[in-house]
Amino acid sequence: MTIIRKKHPLIKLINHSFIDLPTPSNISSWWNFGSLLGLCLIVQILTGLFLAMHYTSDTATAFSSVAHICRDVNYGWLIRYMHANGASMFFICLFLHVGRGVYYGSYNMIETWNMGIILLFAVMATAFMGYVLPWGQMSFWGATVITNLLSAIPYIGTTLVEWIWGGFSVDKATLTRFFAFHFILPFIITALVLVHLLFLHETGSNNPTGLNSDADKIPFHPYYTIKDFLGVLILLMAFMILTLFFPDILGDPDNYTPANPLNTPPHIKPEWYFLFAYAILRSIPNKLGGVLALILSILILSIMPLLHTSKQRALTFRPITQTMYWILVADLLILTWIGGQPVEYPFIIIGQTASIAYFAIIVIFMPIAGMIENNILDLD
C-alpha cells in the first residue's frame, strides 16, 4: 500500500497534499477553516446540482419552481435550505479564514494570499447570482440595485449595464445568464482552490508563532486529519441545527413574495454576509465613489503585505497591533449591523464613521502600531 501511495502518479499527488504533507506541529484550530471551506464547497456543489435538476430559469416559473422543490420533491425542502444556509456557513468560515490570515501574518505568502482574494471575489459573485435565482422581491431588487452600480463607470457604464441585463431592465435574459454563471462558477472556484493549495504547499503552512517551523514538522495524517474531522463534526452540527430549526433566520421575508417590478420593497438589502460592504457603499454620497469604496473594501487585503511594518510576522506577541485588530473586527460587526438599517439618522453618520475607521485602521493605525512595537522591543 505504501508503494502505491508513494509511486502511483495520481495517488502520489493526494499523498503529498493530505497524507505525508509536512505540517507545523503547533498549528491551532484556526487552521481548520481551510478544510471546512472545502467541505462547504462540496456541500454547495452537491445540493446545487440537485436543485438545478428541478429549477427553471424563467421569470414566469422560477419562483413557483422553487416552491415546487420545497413542496413536491422528496427532501426538496432540506436540499433547498441546506443550499441557502450552506452559503451562510461558507461565508462564516471564509471570514474566519481570512481573519486568521490577517492575525497571523499569512499574507506574507503573497501568491497564496492573492489567490485567496481572487477566490473571495469569485465566491461573492457566485453567492450574489444565486440570491437572484429564486426570483422573489429581494432577488429582483437586489439584482437591479447591484448591477445598476456599474452604470457609475464613466462613458461605458450604461452600455455595460444593459449588456449584463440583456435588455433595458432585469428580466428573463438576466435570470437565465445568472443561472448559467451560478452553475459554472463553483467548478471554476474548485480549480482555483487547487491552485491556492498548490501555492500553499510551495511554502508550507504558517503557524501561530509566525516563526519558521522547518525544524519541527509532523505528517498531516493522522494528526491533522483527526483534528480536521472534529472541526467537520462541529460545523455539521451547527449547520444542521441552523437548517432544521431556524432555516429562515438569515433570509429575508420579502423573498417569499414573487418579484414585482412595480412594487419596491421598503428596505433593499443583500444577504447578511454582504452587509459590511453594502454599508461602506452607502456611506459615500457619490455613486462612483461608493462603488470604488465597495471594491476597495475587499481589494485592500491585497496591499496588506506592503503595509506590514513589523519585524515579527504574527500578532501573537504584539499587543498594540492586537488591540487594533480587535477594534477592526468590532468595526466590521458595526458595518454589518449598519448595512441592514434604513438610510436615516443616526445610521448614516455611524456608517460613515465606521467606513472611515475600517480603512484608517488597516492603512494607517496597524502599520504605525507595528513600527512602535519594533521600537519598544528594540528590533531595528
Curated annotation (Swiss-Prot):
Residues binding a ubiquinone, per UniProt: H201
Record text on subunit structure and interactions: The cytochrome bc1 complex contains 11 subunits: 3 respiratory subunits (MT-CYB, CYC1 and UQCRFS1), 2 core proteins (UQCRC1 and UQCRC2) and 6 low-molecular weight proteins (UQCRH/QCR6, UQCRB/QCR7, UQCRQ/QCR8, UQCR10/QCR9, UQCR11/QCR10 and a cleavage product of UQCRFS1). This cytochrome bc1 complex then forms a dimer.
The protein's name in its UniProt record: Cytochrome b
Cell compartments where the protein resides: Mitochondrion inner membrane
Organism per entry: Microtus majori
Names of required cofactors: heme b
Lineage: Eukaryota, Metazoa, Chordata, Craniata, Vertebrata
Role played: Component of the ubiquinol-cytochrome c reductase complex (complex III or cytochrome b-c1 complex) that is part of the mitochondrial respiratory chain. The b-c1 complex mediates electron transfer from ubiquinol to cytochrome c. Contributes to the generation of a proton gradient across the mitochondrial membrane that is then used for ATP synthesis.
SUPFAM superfamilies, per database record: a domain/subunit of cytochrome bc1 complex (Ubiquinol-cytochrome c reductase) (SSF81648), Transmembrane di-heme cytochromes (SSF81342)
Annotated heme b b562 binding sites: H83, H182
A GO term from the CC aspect: mitochondrial inner membrane
Entry similarity comment: Belongs to the cytochrome b family.
Annotated keywords: Electron transport, Heme, Iron, Membrane, Metal-binding, Mitochondrion, Mitochondrion inner membrane, Respiratory chain, Transmembrane, Transmembrane helix, Transport, Ubiquinone
Molecular-function annotations in GO: metal ion binding; ubiquinol-cytochrome-c reductase activity
Membrane spanning stretches: 33-53, 77-98, 113-133, 178-198, 226-246, 288-308, 320-340, 347-367
Membrane topology: Multi-pass membrane protein
Cofactor binding note: Binds 2 heme b groups non-covalently.
Predominant place of localization: mitochondrion
Other comments on record: Heme 1 (or BL or b562) is low-potential and absorbs at about 562 nm, and heme 2 (or BH or b566) is high-potential and absorbs at about 566 nm.
